[in-house]
Amino acid sequence: MRIDGVRLWALLYELDDPAHLEMPQGFDWEAARRQFDGLVARFNSAFQTTCATDRSIEDASYHAEVTVPSDATATGADLVVRVSNFGNLAVLALENPGAYDQEEFDALVHVSDLTRIFECLDEGDYILVPEEPLWAPYDGRVPASVFLQSKPSWWIRYFDYL
């Protein structure tokens, strides 16, 4: 499932709980890991490769990251999917998060790669959110002093180290 616009912002604000910074109340780490491992297996199959993963995440609002290597994509560049600890959110980036704006991303990523990624995410019940809006200044309920960086963003709130 993909979400953007008004629905995206409503969901981000709904998930924002100042009492639970790294993960929502009741977060089931083992279930999240099984869900992520299933995603990686689907990517490996869909792209006929072995994707790189980063599963050793601590002190962060995201759970893990998987990279589809450039030589397995029609795009010819790495495709990175990072999954949040919140609301089954996932984000797709070209090469590295923050490297391209939405217009560049849309122009560079091959539709066949998008189709495979969307299908794999949908099968895992992830909600794909666009990356670019997440770089907007954070104006949620968590005090700004909690964030390590001087300019907190929605990206940090749900997809980065705190």
Across the structure, where does each feature detected by a protein language model lie?
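Short, extreme N-terminal segment that most often corresponds to the first beta-strand
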Residues: M1-R34, W154-L162
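Non-membrane alpha-helical secondary structure
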Residues: I3-R7, A31, Q35, E58, ...
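Generic detector of well-ordered alpha-helical segments enriched in charged/polar residues
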Residues: W9-Y13, D37-V40, L114-D122
